[in-house]
């Protein structure tokens, strides 16, 4: 593990290649969020195809939900791919900017990461330039000055401060999205349940129409349980470092943060844009 001071972290994080990496990571996570919405939409259309007229041919009535379930699987795969890349890019950023086990990446892995960052940035140059110029205090929020320090810190203290900022932001964003997710989930289940109650469809049609959305709900439940478990481990690891600020505990906490980023539980980008400046100011004043 490299020993990085807060001054070194502040300078290193704003090097062009790291700004592009953070921008690419944000684009990947935002793309994952959008693909996840499309997957939900496909599942919902499949579920509500139960309203198709009885007079239609059986092939059409059963084929439409099957088709949309297949489309949902494609969007799910695209979601997972972008979550992977977003987490991978952030993992590289932290490893090299904070200085926690940067040697874990081979030369070929590093080349792939830099190529990915350049490809994403080149595809969105205007938005990319705005993002790398703006900080979290600006509108729209950018990726410059990703980590901020109110006082100079050395070694493990500086690294742990970066980790605390990651944990703090994640909790604040989670608190804002939970009510929306719960309301949306209950609404979907209630609407579909009511529809099933009032309609009389064959078992085959019912299974075809409901399978996609049921699997999607179980997938979301599974991912959120994983997310909660890792979050509890992160909180415990954070408390350990507050008592024993040692390198081995910082490395363990970072591995948990990297693991959580790879779980398909995403921020809501629309909320992040609205509250980023406010939360950035709040952390600066309270830290």
Question: What is each model feature region?
Answer:
Residues 2-32, 77-172, 176-177, 233-287:
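Conserved non-transmembrane functional hotspots
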């Amino acid at each position: 593990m490299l020993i990085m001071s807060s001054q070194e972290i502040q300078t290193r994080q704003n090097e062009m290649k790291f700004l592009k990496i953070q921008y690419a990571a944000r684009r990947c996570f935002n793309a994952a969020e959008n693909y996840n919405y499309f997957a939900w939409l496909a599942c919902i259309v499949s579920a509500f195809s139960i309203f198709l007229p009885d007079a239609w041919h059986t092939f059409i009535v059963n084929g439409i939900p099957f088709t949309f379930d297949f489309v949902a699987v494609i969007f799910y795969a695209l979601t997972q791919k972008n979550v992977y890349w977003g987490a991978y890019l952030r993992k590289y950023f932290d490893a090299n900017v904070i200085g926690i086990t940067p040697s874990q990446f081979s030369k070929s892995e590093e080349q792939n990461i830099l190529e990915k960052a350049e490809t994403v940035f080149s595809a969105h140059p205007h938005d990319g330039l705005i993002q790398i110029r703006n900080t979290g205090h600006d509108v729209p929020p950018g990726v410059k000055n990703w980590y901020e320090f109110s006082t100079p810190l050395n070694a493990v203290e500086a690294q742990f401060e970066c980790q605390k900022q990651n944990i703090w932001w994640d909790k604040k964003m989670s608190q804002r999205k939970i009510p929306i997710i719960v309301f949306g989930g209950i609404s979907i289940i209630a609407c579909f349940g009511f529809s099933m109650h009032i309609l009389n469809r064959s078992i085959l049609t019912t299974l075809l129409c409901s399978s996609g959305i049921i699997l999607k709900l179980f997938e979301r439940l599974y991912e959120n349980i994983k997310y909660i478990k890792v979050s509890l481990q992160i909180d415990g690891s954070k408390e350990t470092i507050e008592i024993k600020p040692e390198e081995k505990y910082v490395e363990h906490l970072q591995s948990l943060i990297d693991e959580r980023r790879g779980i398909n539980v995403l921020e809501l980008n629309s909320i992040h844009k609205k509250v980023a400046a406010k939360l950035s100011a709040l952390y600066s004043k309270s830290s």
